[in-house]
């Protein structure tokens, strides 16, 4: 069974984008390439349990085992040594990516307190969109009672679009609630 959001992309978004930007081929229409979820755990240096818990939560949110990220270089001010585990990340592609994006847009973002839409300034100039989430509790898989500490995470949506305008139209078509 194809994902609901993927079907919407193929049936509604592709024709709309082709009409607006006059693409010569369906293959030229921008699409979501991958979604990267990153959770930096700064206090993992002093307490390794925090990193394990963060990785567990990231696995619940994404449905995929996270990769533990390590420090690239030592920074004395942060009491950080090279090679010490300081975070976790997950790269979603294909079906899981569409499922996550659908869940993010339709369930998780509306659960954010005082939510007025995601900022429009978070495009990087190459058609990718970055979104920071302040707490992991907005995701339905996270049980409120099991959370020891609120942690934020970064969500990077990588698209094949060449410009921010194309990328924004793509994400708007997929239901991303941008602030007015």
From Swiss-Prot:
HAMAP family documented for this protein: Ribosomal_uL5_B
One GO CC annotation: ribonucleoprotein complex
Signal peptide segment: none
Pfam entry (one): Ribosomal_L5_C
Keywords: Ribonucleoprotein, Ribosomal protein, RNA-binding, rRNA-binding, tRNA-binding
Described purpose of this protein according to its UniProt entry: This is one of the proteins that bind and probably mediate the attachment of the 5S RNA into the large ribosomal subunit, where it forms part of the central protuberance. In the 70S ribosome it contacts protein S13 of the 30S subunit (bridge B1b), connecting the 2 subunits; this bridge is implicated in subunit movement. Contacts the P site tRNA; the 5S rRNA and some of its associated proteins might help stabilize positioning of ribosome-bound tRNAs.
Similarity comment: Belongs to the universal ribosomal protein uL5 family.
Self-association and partners: Part of the 50S ribosomal subunit; part of the 5S rRNA/L5/L18/L25 subcomplex. Contacts the 5S rRNA and the P site tRNA. Forms a bridge to the 30S subunit in the 70S ribosome.
GO BP, one annotated term: translation
Cited NCBIfam families: PRK00010.1
PANTHER family: 60S RIBOSOMAL PROTEIN L11-RELATED
Protein's organism: Streptococcus gordonii (strain Challis / ATCC 35105 / BCRC 15272 / CH1 / DL1 / V288)
InterPro entries (UniProt xref): Ribosomal_uL5, Ribosomal_uL5_bac-type, Ribosomal_uL5_C, Ribosomal_uL5_CS, Ribosomal_uL5_dom_sf, Ribosomal_uL5_N
Domain of life where this protein originates: Bacteria
One Gene Ontology MF term: tRNA binding
Full protein name: Large ribosomal subunit protein uL5
């Amino acid at each position: 069974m194809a994902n609901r959001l993927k079907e919407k992309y193929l049936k509604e978004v592709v024709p709309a984008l082709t009409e607006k930007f006059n693409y010569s081929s369906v293959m030229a229409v921008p699409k979501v390439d991958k979604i990267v979820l990153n959770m930096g755990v700064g206090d993992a240096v002093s307490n390794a349990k925090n990193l394990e818990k963060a990785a567990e939560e990231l696995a619940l949110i994404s449905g995929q085992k996270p990769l533990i990220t390590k420090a690239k270089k030592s920074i004395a001010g942060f009491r950080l040594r090279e090679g010490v585990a300081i975070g976790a990340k997950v790269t979603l592609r294909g079906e899981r990516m569409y499922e996550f994006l659908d869940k993010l847009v339709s369930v998780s973002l509306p659960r954010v307190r005082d939510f007025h839409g995601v900022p429009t300034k978070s495009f990087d100039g190459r058609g990718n969109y970055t979104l920071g989430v302040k707490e992991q509790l907005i995701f339905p898989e996270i049980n409120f009672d099991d959370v020891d500490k609120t942690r934020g995470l970064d969500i990077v949506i990588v698209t094949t679009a060449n410009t921010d305008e194309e990328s924004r139209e793509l994400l708007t078509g997929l239901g991303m609630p941008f602030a007015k």
